[in-house]
Amino acid sequence: MAKDLSNQIVDVCRFSYAGEGGFASATMEQWALEAMLYDPARMKQRFVLFEQICLPSLAAQTDQDFTLIALIADTMPYRWRRLKDLMAPYPFLQVCTLEAAGPLNSTRRAFRRGWDRHSKFITGFRIDDDAVACDYIAKTRAVADQLLKLGWADEDTPAAIAFHRGIYWNMNSQEKPYWEFSEIGPLGLASAMVTHNDSLANVYRWNHRKIAANVRTWCDPNDVMFVRTLHGVNDSNRSIPPLPS
């Protein structure tokens, strides 16, 4: 009997999720974290980036067989829960509401929420205020399926897929806002992880800079696969890579 290598692609986006740890604000008191995350000006920009950059790039995918889980906290003010209104024009989008929890626990539950209940494996990726290439899902699926066939990923062994090259968009620069750059290792953006559907691990398990030190990793530094935004409201300590000489 042929082995079951069925594989579902699921993205989890922590949408201003007031959880415990995982970002630069991890040391803040919960009330201060929520005040920062739900600041009206910050939330308005968050929605603009999500609606104008992230969602359109996913809607343009050549392979539409995927699920996007927007993870929000149960403390999010009601006015910002209009996020759920976006589920109608974007059928791949689901909203998952959870209490505050650590990054691995919360994202594991969010991935389970997006699971179709029959695929044996989940290829989970992450996206935030950014865009991925229109063929990102198709290419990620093709690589993931090959990794499963080769045994690089199985029930007990996860494997990562990382595309390193993309376009950086510095929203604070008018002179040279865009440039192409290839990272030396995996980013959180345009990286995915193939795991068993009941695995304790997922793409949030390790800092993206440490994924290749902990998981078998397939890398592609050649294809331009993302647009990464650089702005003032992201809380992931994003750094600006060197401009081309």
Identify the meaning behind each predicted range.
Residues 42, 72-80:
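A conserved acidic beta->alpha catalytic loop
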Residues 65-75, 97-99:
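Short beta-strand/loop segment that forms part of the nucleotide-sugar
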Residues 102-118, 132-217:
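Conserved catalytic core of nucleotide-sugar-dependent glycosyltransferases
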